């Protein structure tokens, strides 16, 4: 991420295939208070296992709220949650809004195209003005890696920041809802083989998932994809790298498929979508190479016929829609935990 002194953020630089897996934003851990409590959620990287389990356990308690006649709890009553989405979103923005409302918060969705940012107002000036309106929590999605860190560093002390996806860097709540989904179906992380397939180079979800999986003790994490779409540094994380889909899928318990992020690519990294599907698309035949009870996941949006066949996406081993459902409870848990923390 590039910033000028006013806090304007620029687009991330185009990635090279050998881009390192880790980003260098963390100085200490700005997400935690001096007492080790979660004040902001900016990335899964660097968070202890205890905090990840705290979030997953809290989400477990909120899942039942969905089944109630009155789908509300008063945990954030009187709090103001601002959704600041500088990038398009369907699932993430909607589930954050639902989650905040189920916690009884007041929710403000900032229309970026109609806001003063479209008139040249800097990111920090926007944040300072919203803080002056006594915001309690910012949910931020931004095209620039590191933008939520900038906001957390400069916002008022009482304000909490949740990263809803920043560039290629991180998507921590997606990573957490993926972990919740895996735990729901598989229970024990320490006996699993998990495969992440596709455009890992440009995927903030893949980065968050890998940090979460390794922190939670998954013994074998596999990254599967063409050489042009895998970042450097995966092996140093303990990840097994495969450049052949059939080999990488053998006997895995969990398959996480990723879409091609064409909007973040520069240059011709791949052949056509049809050719990609032939080599890297998850078909029923390829799914049969995995464990018989393997589950199939996808963070969305899906591109059917590119990275996944419709028979798999809609089949009995797919838990893709369950991920969306669980995402509400996980985001309720994250907001409830960070908003209840003070320095």
From Swiss-Prot:
Pathway: Pyrimidine metabolism; UMP biosynthesis via de novo pathway; (S)-dihydroorotate from bicarbonate: step 2/3
EC id: 2.1.3.2
GO biological process: 'de novo' pyrimidine nucleobase biosynthetic process; 'de novo' UMP biosynthetic process; amino acid metabolic process
MF annotations from Gene Ontology: amino acid binding; aspartate carbamoyltransferase activity
Keyword Phosphoprotein: no
Keyword Transferase appears in the UniProt entry: yes
Residues given in the record as L-aspartate binding sites: 119, 204, 259
Pfam families for the chain: OTCace, OTCace_N
Family: Belongs to the aspartate/ornithine carbamoyltransferase superfamily. ATCase family.
Protein's job: Catalyzes the condensation of carbamoyl phosphate and aspartate to form carbamoyl aspartate and inorganic phosphate, the committed step in the de novo pyrimidine nucleotide biosynthesis pathway.
Oligomer and partners: Heterododecamer (2C3:3R2) of six catalytic PyrB chains organized as two trimers (C3), and six regulatory PyrI chains organized as three dimers (R2).
Protein name: Aspartate carbamoyltransferase catalytic subunit
Species for this entry: Burkholderia mallei (strain ATCC 23344)
Source species taxonomy: Bacteria, Pseudomonadati, Pseudomonadota, Betaproteobacteria, Burkholderiales
Gene: pyrB
């Amino acid at each position: 991420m590039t910033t000028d002194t006013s806090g304007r953020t620029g687009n991330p630089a185009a990635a090279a295939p050998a881009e390192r897996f880790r980003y260098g934003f963390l100085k200490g851990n700005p997400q935690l208070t001096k007492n080790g409590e979660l004040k902001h959620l900016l990335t899964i990287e660097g968070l202890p296992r205890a905090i990840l389990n705290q979030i997953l356990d809290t989400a477990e308690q909120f899942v039942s709220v969905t089944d109630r006649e009155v789908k509300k709890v008063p945990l954030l009553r009187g709090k103001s949650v601002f959704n600041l989405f500088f990038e398009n979103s369907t699932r993430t923005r909607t589930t954050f809004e639902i989650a905040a409302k189920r916690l009884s918060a007041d929710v403000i969705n900032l229309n970026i195209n109609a806001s003063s940012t479209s008139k040249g107002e800097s990111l920090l000036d926007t944040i300072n003005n919203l803080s002056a309106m006594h915001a309690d929590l910012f949910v931020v999605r931004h095209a620039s890696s590191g933008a939520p860190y900038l906001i957390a560093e400069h916002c008022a002390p009482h304000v909490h920041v949740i990263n809803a996806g920043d560039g290629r860097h991180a998507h921590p709540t997606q990573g957490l809802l993926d972990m919740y989904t895996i735990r729901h179906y598989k229970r024990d992380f320490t006996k699993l083989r998990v495969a992440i397939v596709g455009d890992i180079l440009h995927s903030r979800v893949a980065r968050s998932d890998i940090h979460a999986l390794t922190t939670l003790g998954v013994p074998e994490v596999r990254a599967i994809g063409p050489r042009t779409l895998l970042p450097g540094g995966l092996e140093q994380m303990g990840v097994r790298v495969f450049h052949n889909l059939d080999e990488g899928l053998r006997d895995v318990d969990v398959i996480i498929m990723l879409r091609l992020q064409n909007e973040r690519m520069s240059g011709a990294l791949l052949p056509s979508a049809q050719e990609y599907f032939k080599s890297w698309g998850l078909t029923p035949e390829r799914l049969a190479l995995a464990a018989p009870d393997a589950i199939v996941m996808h963070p969305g949006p899906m591109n059917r016929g590119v990275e996944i066949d419709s028979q798999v996406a809609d089949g009995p081993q797919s838990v893709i829609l369950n991920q969306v459902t669980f995402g509400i409870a996980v985001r309720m848990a994250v907001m409830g935990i960070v908003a209840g923390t003070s320095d």
